Swiss-Prot record:
Entry's family note: Belongs to the bacterial ribosomal protein bS20 family.
Record bears the keyword Ribonucleoprotein: yes
Any one annotated GO CC term: small ribosomal subunit
Listed Pfam families: Ribosomal_S20p
Organism of provenance: Clostridium perfringens (strain SM101 / Type A)
Function of the protein: Binds directly to 16S ribosomal RNA.
Molecular function as annotated in GO: small ribosomal subunit rRNA binding; structural constituent of ribosome
Domain of life from the UniProt record: Bacteria
UniProt-recorded name of the protein: Small ribosomal subunit protein bS20
Keywords: Ribonucleoprotein, Ribosomal protein, RNA-binding, rRNA-binding
């Protein structure tokens, strides 16, 4: 247990940021899964709109520092390839 005031504050801040990061990652995974379900169902119109949402979630999480920007770019590229392969 922390005794110093600044250490106590860091614990609180870390817990808050960890919760925020978990929330963002969870939303990101949900967006990607929704897109992949639409691709499996071969629903191109729905998949196109869900791709935009997934790409937005990836960009947002990368800009917030939750995931690495290269990881976000790689995932977006793979999702776009899946979308284009549906044609």
């Amino acid at each position: 247990m922390a005794n110093i005031k600044s250490a106590k504050k860091r614990i609180k801040v870390t817990e808050k940021k960890t919760l925020r990061n978990k929330m963002i990652k969870s939303a990101l995974k949900t967006a990607i899964k929704k897109f992949e379900v639409a691709v499996e169902a071969n629903n191109k119109a729905e998949a196109a709109t869900l791709y935009v949402e997934a790409a937005r979630a990836l960009d947002m999480s990368a800009s917030k520092g939750v995931v690495h920007k290269n990881m976000a770019a790689r995932k977006k590229s793979r999702l776009a390839a899946k979308l284009n392969a549906m044609a």
